[in-house]
């Protein structure tokens, strides 16, 4: 089964996706309707929640394998829930994909400040990438991923 993932925050940055999963994926611009993206207070990353009439821009990663999805689930943690959504790309009006959504019961935890990709890249990416690489290294060893059996 071919899996697609909609990245809308730090995961829309291919360097972050590659650092977390250890792989690069083909990607294209995409839009998720009826959702809004805002910063989480005290954090440098955003979350999304259902908000009718709003749109979130991001990227659609294609052919994401199950091991990478398992790593992404761990990376996103318990605060985010992986959900199936439909996004639009320039060539396809409806594409099924997974994305990470903050559950409705946590909506009040959002700030009113929108997330800015360029600000994140300029101010935080340099420090965030080593964290992502360390996460990948520790989790792949813990889970036995990518290790040949002898």
Regions found by a protein language model. Give the residues of each.
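Glycine-aromatic micro-motifs
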Residues: 1-150
């Amino acid at each position: 089964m071919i899996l697609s993932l909609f990245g809308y925050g730090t995961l829309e940055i291919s360097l972050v996706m590659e650092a977390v999963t250890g792989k690069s994926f083909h990607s294209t611009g995409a839009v998720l309707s009826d959702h809004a993206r805002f910063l989480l207070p005290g954090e440098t990353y955003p979350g999304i929640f259902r908000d009718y009439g709003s749109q979130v821009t991001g990227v659609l990663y294609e052919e994401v394998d199950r091991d990478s999805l398992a790593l992404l689930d761990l990376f996103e943690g318990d605060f985010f829930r992986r959900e199936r959504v439909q996004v639009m790309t320039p060539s396809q009006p409806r594409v099924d994909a997974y994305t990470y959504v903050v559950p409705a019961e946590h909506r009040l935890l959002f700030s009113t400040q929108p997330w800015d990709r360029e600000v994140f890249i300029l101010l935080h990416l340099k420090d965030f990438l080593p964290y992502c690489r360390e996460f990948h290294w520790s989790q792949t060893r813990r889970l036995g991923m990518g290790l040949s059996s002898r």
